A protein has these predicted regions:
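Helix-to-loop junctions at the C-terminal end of transmembrane segments
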Residues: 174-187, 270
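Pair of pore-lining "gating" transmembrane helices in MFS-fold secondary transporters
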Residues: 121-138, 219-220
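Juxtamembrane intracellular "pre-TM" segments in multi-pass secondary transporters
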Residues: 97-129
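A late C-terminal transmembrane helix in Major Facilitator Superfamily
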Residues: 239-273
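Helix-breaking motifs and short loop linkers at transmembrane-helix boundaries and internal kinks
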Residues: 4-11, 39, 208-209
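C-terminal transmembrane helical hairpin of 12-TM major facilitator-type secondary transporters
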Residues: 189-232
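Cytoplasmic helix-loop-helix junction between adjacent transmembrane helices
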Residues: 15-53
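Helix-loop-helix hairpin linking two adjacent transmembrane segments in secondary transporters
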Residues: 49-96
C-alpha cells in the first residue's frame, strides 16, 4: 500500500525491492508447511492443489491489474492488489490450522549451511532441483517471447489479444491437482514425464505458423508445466531428510535461477537465430528433463 502513496521514483523502487524480498520467502514456507503437515500418500495431491492455486493467482493478478489500470491507472492497480493481499492475510490467519509437526531449531549459520549440504548431497533432491531449473526456465522463455512472435508477421496480433493468452493458465489450475492425484497410481516419475511430454508437444505446436495450433500448443504446454511442477515440488517434501523449508528454498532458487538463465539465453537465440531455433532449444531442455526424471 505504501507504493501507492510515495512520490519518489527511487523510494518506489526500494519499496518494490522489499516487496520482492518478502514475497520470495512465501512459496518456500508454503511448500514446507504442506510437506510437513501431510503424510506421504496424500502429499502429492495436496501440493497439486497448492500449485493450482498459484496458477489461479497468477491469472487473476494479471487480469485484475490490467482492468484496474485501465480504470484508474497504476495507483489503483497496486492499491487494489494490496487490498486483496490484506484480505487474503486475514483469511490466512483465521483459517490456517496450527502446525502439528514443525520443530523449532535455533538460528545458526553452521546449522543452515549443514542443512544445505545435506540436501545437495541427496541425489533425488539434486534431480528435483534440476527439474525446477529446466521446467521453469523453459516456461518463462516461451511466455516471454511468444508475444513478440505473435505481434510480428504473419500474425500481427494486438497487445490486448496477446494478453488474453494468459487465460491458458486456467489449464494449469486443473492439471496441477490432477497430476497430484495420479502420482499414487502411476508413480511420480511417470506422471512427471507425462507432464514434460505435454510440454514437448506444446512446443512442437508453437513452432507452427498456424495461429490455432499455437494457441492449442500453449494450452498443452501450460497443462504439462503445472502438472510436472506440482509433482516435482511435492517430491521435495517427501525426499528431504528434515529441514524441509530449506529444501523447498533450494528448489525455488533453482526454479528462479532457471527463469533468469534460460530466459536470457532464449532472448539471445530469438534475436540472433529466430523462432524455430528457439523452439529447438526448449525441446532439448525438456528432453533432458524427461531423461533425468529417472532419478525419482
Amino acid at each position: 500500500l505504501a507504493c501507492v502513496l510515495v512520490e519518489s521514483w527511487n523510494l518506489l523502487l526500494a519499496l518494490r525491492a522489499l516487496l520482492g524480498l518478502a514475497l520470495s520467502g512465501l512459496p518456500a514456507l508454503a511448500m514446507a508447511y504442506v510437506g510437513e503437515e501431510f503424510d506421504p500418500p496424500s502429499l502429492p495431491a495436496a501440493m497439486g492443489l497448492y500449485i493450482g492455486g498459484t496458477a489461479l493467482g497468477g491469472l487473476l493478478g494479471r487480469l485484475l491489474s490490467g482492468l484496474l489500470s485501465d480504470i484508474g491507472g497504476w495507483e489503483l492497480a497496486l492499491g487494489g492488489i494490496a487490498g486483496l493481499g490484506l484480505l487474503a492475510l486475514g483469511l490466512f490467519v483465521w483459517l490456517l490450522p496450527a502446525s502439528r509437526h514443525f520443530k523449532a531449531q535455533p538460528l545458526s549459520l553452521r546449522v543452515l549451511l549443514g542443512n544445505f549440504r545435506l540436501h545437495l548431497r541427496n541425489p533425488r533432491l539434486r534431480g528435483l532441483f534440476l527439474q525446477a531449473f529446466l521446467l521453469m526456465g523453459g516456461f518463462v522463455a516461451l511466455f516471454n517471447y511468444i508475444g513478440f512472435r505473435l505481434a510480428g508477421a504473419p500474425f500481427g496480433l494486438s497487445s490486448t489479444v496477446i494478453g488474453l493468452l494468459f487465460v491458458v493458465y486456467l489449464a494449469g489450475i486443473f492439471s496441477a491437482g490432477w497430476a497430484g492425484r495420479l502420482v499414487p497410481r502411476f508413480g511420480a516419475r511417470n506422471v512427471l514425464r507425462g507432464g514434460v511430454g505435454l510440454m514437448l508437444l506444446g512446443v512442437a505446436l508453437c513452432a507452427s505458423a498456424w495461429l490455432a495450433a499455437i494457441v492449442l500448443g500453449l494450452g498443452l504446454f501450460t497443462l504439462g508445466f503445472f502438472a510436472a511442477h506440482a509433482v516435482a515440488s511435492g517430491q521435495v517434501g517427501i525426499h528431504a531428510e528434515g529441514a524441509k523449508a530449506q529444501a523447498s528454498a533450494l528448489y525455488l532458487c533453482a526454479y528462479y535461477l532457471g527463469s533468469s538463465v534460460v530466459g536470457y539465453v532464449a532472448g539471445y537465440v530469438w534475436e540472433h537465430a529466430g523462432w524455430l531455433p528457439l523452439m529447438a532449444v526448449l525441446a532439448a531442455l525438456f528432453v533432458i528433463a524427461a531423461w533425468r526424471a529417472r532419478s525419482l
